[in-house]
Amino acid sequence: MSETAPAAPAAAPPAEKTPVKKKAAKKPAGARRKASGPPVSELITKAVAASKERSGVSLAALKKALAAAGYDVEKNNSRIKLGLKSLVSKGTLVQTKGTGASGSFKLNKKAATGEAKPKAKKAGAAKPKKAAGAAKKTKKATGAATPKKTAKKTPKKAKKPAAAAVTKKVAKSPKKAKAAKPKKAAKSAAKAVKPKAAKPKVAKPKKAAPKKK
């Protein structure tokens, strides 16, 4: 009995895993159903635009075109009628004959051109925004550059006192030179006086000449 008892719980886990696999398989199937194809309104507009009839496309001709495109007309008959009504109310299609979904339908050219124009306007409006953004960036760049100019100017102001100090030193130096010149002149005058005092010394040999021994 001890050998058969652990075999029962070992068989239970695979039974629990199987429903998880089934759920995982169901999710992609649901996603495929949703993304089976484009909506009915797009198919109707394409079929009406492709037709060359001036009076418009009838419901029977529209169903044939949808069936040729691979759309299940029998199952989605109510959706086709609702799609036609919604497109007429929006203005994308114009009903040329009949009432409701039983008449003939034609593509509204004014609505098609009107839809194209707002897109072009939006694209044109988007460009000035980018230009405005670029202008803001340039303004920010210039605003950031102005402090640099002020920073450059401040050292110049600091340099001016240094230049003034140099001029003061230059102004003081001539005074020293002027004060030094009189000293040199005094020395030269003293030197000039000394030779005058030396002249009487030359007369001494004359006194010694008359002496006789």
From Swiss-Prot:
Keywords: Acetylation, ADP-ribosylation, Chromosome, Citrullination, DNA-binding, Hydroxylation, Methylation, Nucleus, Phosphoprotein. InterPro entries: H1/H5 (IPR005819), Histone_H1/H5_H15 (IPR005818), WH-like_DNA-bd_sf (IPR036388), WH_DNA-bd_sf (IPR036390). Residues 36-109 form the H15 domain. PROSITE patterns: H15. SUPFAM superfamilies: Winged helix' DNA-binding domain. The modification N-acetylserine is found at residue 2. The modification N6-(2-hydroxyisobutyryl)lysine is found at residues 23, 26-27, 46, 52, 63-64, 75, 81, 85, 90, 97, 110, 117, 121, 129, 136, 148, 159, 168. H1 histones are progressively phosphorylated during the cell cycle, becoming maximally phosphorylated during late G2 phase and M phase, and being dephosphorylated sharply thereafter. Crotonylation (Kcr) is specifically present in male germ cells and marks testis-specific genes in post-meiotic cells, including X-linked genes that escape sex chromosome inactivation in haploid cells. Crotonylation marks active promoters and enhancers and confers resistance to transcriptional repressors. It is also associated with post-meiotically activated genes on autosomes. GO terms for cellular component: euchromatin; nucleosome; nucleus. It is found in: Nucleus; Chromosome. The modification N6-methyllysine is found at residues 34, 187. The modification N6-(beta-hydroxybutyryl)lysine is found at residues 34, 52, 64, 85, 90, 106. The keyword Hydrolase does not apply. GO terms for molecular function: double-stranded DNA binding; nucleosomal DNA binding; structural constituent of chromatin. The modification N6-crotonyllysine is found at residues 34, 64, 85, 90, 97, 159, 168. GO terms for biological process: chromosome condensation; negative regulation of DNA recombination; negative regulation of transcription by RNA polymerase II; nucleosome assembly. The modification N6-acetyllysine is found at residue 17. The C-terminal domain is required for high-affinity binding to chromatin. Histone H1 protein binds to linker DNA between nucleosomes forming the macromolecular structure known as the chromatin fiber. Histones H1 are necessary for the condensation of nucleosome chains into higher-order structured fibers. Also acts as a regulator of individual gene transcription through chromatin remodeling, nucleosome spacing and DNA methylation. This is Histone H1.2.
